């Protein structure tokens, strides 16, 4: 309850689109703070547990926090008429999260058994994992979310922590494929 009658709400905003974008910005600011708080509270915890538990935390946020639910839904399903404006909110948020995670991975290198990978690549791989699992939450709910999480997490973690003489032995470098 904000105390604004429906006919007068547009006196505070230029229109429905402006109202939507203001709420979207607010939701992203709130979630940015909550995510920062999540990682700050766990800075002494192992990175494996922090990253793994974040996936469960995101599910809990989606189920219990209206800003998180709104943010995730409109990130994946933006209104067609506001597509570019929504991307101008979503992409900087994701870039910021990627930079923070890269920094966290770089700082954890001395304490964690990482493969010889760039922290930026590991951060991007993790964010891709999060995206894929969240899509399942949005489309299918918690049961399929957990099914995907349980299948993908061990493969991801082994991939970034595997240190062996076979590392890179396939000769396949995906960066070269794109170029």
Model-derived regions, located:
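Amphipathic alpha-helical segments used for helix-helix packing
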Residues: 62-85
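C-terminal peripheral helix-coil segments that are non-catalytic and often amphipathic
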Residues: 53-60, 95, 99-107, 127-129, ...
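Residue-level recognition of alpha-helical structural elements
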Residues: 43, 47, 86, 115-119, ...
């Amino acid at each position: 309850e904000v105390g604004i009658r429906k006919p007068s709400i547009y006196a505070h905003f230029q229109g429905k689109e402006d109202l939507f974008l203001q709420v979207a910005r607010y939701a992203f600011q709130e979630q940015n703070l909550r995510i920062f708080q999540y990682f700050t509270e766990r800075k002494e915890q192992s990175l494996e547990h922090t990253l793994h538990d974040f996936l469960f935390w995101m599910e809990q946020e989606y189920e219990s926090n209206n800003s998180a639910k709104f943010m995730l839904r409109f990130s994946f399903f933006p209104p067609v008429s506001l597509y570019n404006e929504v991307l101008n909110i979503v992409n900087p948020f994701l870039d910021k999260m990627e930079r923070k995670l890269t920094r966290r991975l770089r700082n954890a290198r001395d304490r964690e058994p990482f493969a010889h990978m760039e922290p930026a690549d590991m951060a991007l791989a993790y964010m891709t994992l999060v995206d894929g699992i969240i899509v399942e939450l949005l489309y299918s709910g918690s049961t399929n979310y957990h099914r995907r999480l349980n299948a993908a997490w061990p493969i991801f973690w082994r991939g970034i922590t595997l240190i062996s003489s076979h590392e890179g032995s396939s000769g396949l470098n995906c960066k070269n494929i794109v170029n």
